Amino acid sequence: MSDLKTESQDLQQEENALIALRKEKLAAERAKGNAFPNDFRRDSYCNDLQKQYADKTKEELEAAAIPVKVAGRIMLNRGSFMVIQDMTGRIQVYVNRKTLPEETLAAVKTWDLGDIISAEGTLARSGKGDLYVEMTNVRLLTKSLRPLPDKHHGLTDTEQRYRQRYVDLMVNEETRHTFRVRSQVISHIRKFLIERDFLEVETPMLQTIPGGAAAKPFETHHNALDMAMFLRIAPELYLKRLVVGGFEKVFEINRNFRNEGVSTRHNPEFTMLEFYQAYADYRDNMDLTEELFRELAQLVLGSTDVPYGDKVFHFGEPFVRLSVFDSILKYNPELTAADLQDVDRAREIAKKAGAKVLGHEGLGKLQVMIFEELVEHKLEQPHFITEYPFEVSPLARRNDDNPAVTDRFELFIGGREIANAYSELNDAEDQAERFLAQVAEKDAGDDEAMHYDADFVRALEYGMPPTAGEGIGIDRLVMLLTNSPSIRDVILFPHMRPQA
C-alpha cells in the first residue's frame, strides 16, 4: 500500500473521530433545549466595524462604549478570544471571564472551529491595535459537525475546491473575492446598459428549435406536450424577435447550455450577456465594448492594465481591429493571399494545421479553420477580428463592399474569444436561404449547423430595423479581471464527473 494511500486513510479515520465527537456535543446541546436557535438579529458586519472605527483609539472606544451585535463562524479559537467570520470579513471577540456567566464560559470551551455563534458586547482595541468585541453575551447558533480544513493542509485539492465550494468559500479569501468581483461585474454591466436605454428582458430556456449559435444542444422531452425540447444554446433569435416587435434596445444576462467538451475555457452551462440595438452596426458595438471593458477594469482593478498570469493586457489602448484574412497573413508570414484564395490549397493548410476537415467545406469556412488553428492563440492583447466569411455567419449581414464576408467581429483577449457581434441580417429571404444552407451542412455531418427556424423568418418578414447585436461571455471576462486560470474558478458550482 502506498504511503499516500495510507496517509489518506489515516486522515479519514481522524476526521471520522472528530465528527463523532462533534455529534456528541450536538446531542448535549439538544438535551439543553433548542440546539438551533433563530432569534438573534445582528446589527453590524465584521468588516464594516473594522472600517468604521479604524481611526478610533483604545481610549476613545473605551469612553464611547459602543454596543454591537455580530455573528459568524469561528475561524480561530484561543480560549480567551475567538476570531469570527461573516460575509464581509473577520473580527475578534473577547471571552471576558469577569462578565460572562460560568455556564457560558463552560459552553465556550466545548465550541469548535466552524461553529456559528452570536456575540453581543462593546467595541474595544487591544494593546496590539486590533479591534475586538468585548462580549457581554455569546451563544452557539449552529454546531458544525464537520471540521474545517486545518491551516497546514488547507483545502489545496483543486477538484475538492470545486466539488465543495461551500468549504472553499469558508476558508479561502481569494475565492470569496473572485465571486464578489463576479457580482460586481454583472451589476455594473446591467447599470451600464440601462443607463443607455437598454431594456432587460428574459427569453425561453426551453426551446423547440435550438438556434442563435453553432453548437450541440442538450435535448429533453416535454411529457405533457409529448415533444422534444432543447436547452437553449443562445437567446439571439428571441431577442431579435423583440427588436422586430419594437423593443429597439434589449439585453439579457442569463445561462446558455452547450453539450460539448469541458476544459479550462469551457463549461456546458455558462453565463452570457447578449444585447441588441436598432439603428446601429457592428462598429458601434466595437466602440461600446471598448468603453464597457475599460470601465470594468477601472472598477475592479483601479486601472485599465489587466494582469493575467505573466502578461498584462492593456484595456486603455485602442483595441486592434483586423480582418480574419489579414490576421492569418500577419501571424503566418509564410502564407500568401493566393494560398487563402484557393480552396484546394486552403484545405491542405487547414488539415496540416490540425483542423477537422470533412471535405465539403467552402473556402470561407476553411479560412476560419486556419484562423482558429494558427492565429487565435496568438491574439494576446485585445483584438477585434472582423469580416468573417458569410458561410460561417448565418445570422450576420453581408458586407456592402465584399458580399463574401459579413459585418461581424469576435473579440479575443489572451488568445480566447470573449465576445461575438455583428450587424444583424434583416433580409428575410436571405435568412431563409442561409438556414437552408445550414440544414444541408447538418445533413452532411456538421452537428453544430443550425436548424431552419420558420417562425424567425416570419418575424423578419414583418421587418426588422437595421440592428447590431453582441454576445459577451461573462465567465471568461471574469477570468480576466480576477486573474483566474480556469473557468471553473469563476463558476460557483462547475460541472464535475460524479465521485466514485
UniProtKB/Swiss-Prot annotation:
SUPFAM superfamilies: Class II aaRS and biotin synthetases, Nucleic acid-binding proteins. Mg(2+) 1 binds at residues 410, 417. It catalyses: tRNA(Lys) + L-lysine + ATP = L-lysyl-tRNA(Lys) + AMP + diphosphate. Its EC number is 6.1.1.6. GO terms for cellular component: cytosol. Pfam families: tRNA-synt_2, tRNA_anti-codon. One of its GO terms (biological process) is lysyl-tRNA aminoacylation. Mg(2+) 2 binds at residue 417. The keyword Nucleotidyltransferase does not apply. Keywords: Aminoacyl-tRNA synthetase, ATP-binding, Cytoplasm, Ligase, Magnesium, Metal-binding, Nucleotide-binding, Protein biosynthesis. Its main location: cytoplasm. Its cofactor is Mg(2+). GO terms for molecular function: ATP binding; lysine-tRNA ligase activity; magnesium ion binding; tRNA binding. PROSITE patterns: AA_TRNA_LIGASE_II. The keyword Phosphoprotein does not apply. Binds 3 Mg(2+) ions per subunit. It is found in: Cytoplasm. Homodimer. Belongs to the class-II aminoacyl-tRNA synthetase family. This is Lysine--tRNA ligase. The gene is lysS.
